[in-house]
Amino acid sequence: MAEADDGGNGDGATAGDCYAHHHYRDVKLARDASENIDSISSLPDVILQQILSSLPTNLAIRTSVLSTRWRHVWSDTPYIYFDGPGTLYRGLKADTINKTLARYKLPKIMSFHLYTKIF
């Protein structure tokens, strides 16, 4: 008769038992995490717009790929922020600014920031 390998701790558990327990726990944690993965989308638009207002405009626009609901949230933020010479907008062109403003929905911009270098 084969004896269970207790791993020297005297609990009689086999390596298979330990694996099964950890596997079940990992699956449960993954399932619990997946249930809450999109909780930010349940926030009201006004809160999402405030969050996006704290980001440079190009990063706020990138959130539009998250879901249909997010597609136009950035265009209702009261702040537009272009950071030209940094890593966010290399080679910022007037065409990029014009296209962004054309997609903007609000009738009034509360703040417009444009930082670029001519040369």
Swiss-Prot record:
Q: Which InterPro entries match?
A: F-box-like_dom_sf (IPR036047), F-box_AtFBL13-like (IPR053781), F-box_dom (IPR001810), FBL60-like (IPR055294)
Q: Which domain of life is it from?
A: Eukaryota
What Pfam families does UniProt report for this protein, alphabetically? F-box
User: Taking every annotated instance into account, which residue ranges of this chain make up the domain F-box?
Assistant: 37-92
Protein's name in the database: Putative F-box protein At2g39415
